[in-house]
């Protein structure tokens, strides 16, 4: 059973990469991840600007352990360039797995491009096996990472927004020219224009596209209309939660669609990240088109020890299905998902009711969109009756029926 991955020249013993996050701020974390079987490690994001306000932040994370999710975020650390250099240098003395350095790519200026390129060169010299350019787009402004820009939490707008994809393209070209190691590009789902960004990345010769980062939103269940004062996520050490809080299972709904979208749009290998909480999600990400996966929240909640269970579950699944390698099921979902309605071929069908099963509950007659010019389903003599001329063939009623009395059949 072969679960190895070749990713931009890196030899990974399995598809589990530790994503950039607060789980990657010191050497002990990297050593522990390697011990439990991580294939590679990406360090916490580095802000290469001296005195950036984001560097003084502190980690604040509330966890819902039963739901296997983060309940709230109120802050996270950043590394300065010197800290990132030290971490990479120390890690390469202690571990054998590939270790990459995450570097933020912020404001679309020539000065920023030069700063990022210089930082990448320095981290490469310290032994980084790859560089990950964290192209968060408008997010650094939202985070208020710099002193002059972003204190109000406003997004990029106007000319700055228009320049960002081109800026990313030029920065990647500059970094690729400056270093002789693979360069990854990380995308945020809250970015200005994800399709334009990944296209710019591929055009610039990026080696791997990391799709992606935490999403804008609040975790389900955190709003209590009866106790609005608890909106802070039960934090003792913070008075608010961050709106960039979509992680775990909730984030995976977005990440899988973006992985598929990226797989349809570019040929560059994709590192699938976002809501990978167990082996099943690794399989799903690979079936969505990912070459490998990056995991963060699951480790923040349950520790690196779950890597062993992830690998065991993956191998067991492959044995049960008869897969010898990851390539055999990579991308299986890609052609089953369309990006636009125009890509989908629909068939003329109508709803058929099995009156022996029908209880006459009337649920099938309630959907507001039912019918061409009037409702296609009526309840007559305590049974659902379909007017085939009015039936849209939408299949909603078949899914609603608690008795499974409705099936869809092709029109002759």
Please give the residue ranges for each predicted region:
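N-terminal capping/small domains of soluble enzymes
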Residues: 1-99, 104-111
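C-terminal helical cap(s) of enzyme catalytic domains, especially alpha/beta-barrels
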Residues: 53-66, 218-248, 286-287, 298-323
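Glycine/Thr-rich beta-alpha phosphate-binding loop at enzyme active sites
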Residues: 135-166, 197-264, 268, 302
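Iron-sulfur cluster-binding cysteine motifs and their immediate structural context
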Residues: 363-382, 396-411
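Active-site beta->alpha loop and helix N-cap motifs at the rims of alpha/beta catalytic domains
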Residues: 66-165
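Catalytic cores of alpha/beta
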Residues: 28-32, 114-125, 191-204, 264-265, ...
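Alpha-helix-loop-beta-strand connector modules within alpha/beta enzyme cores
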Residues: 64-97, 155-185, 235-269, 310-323
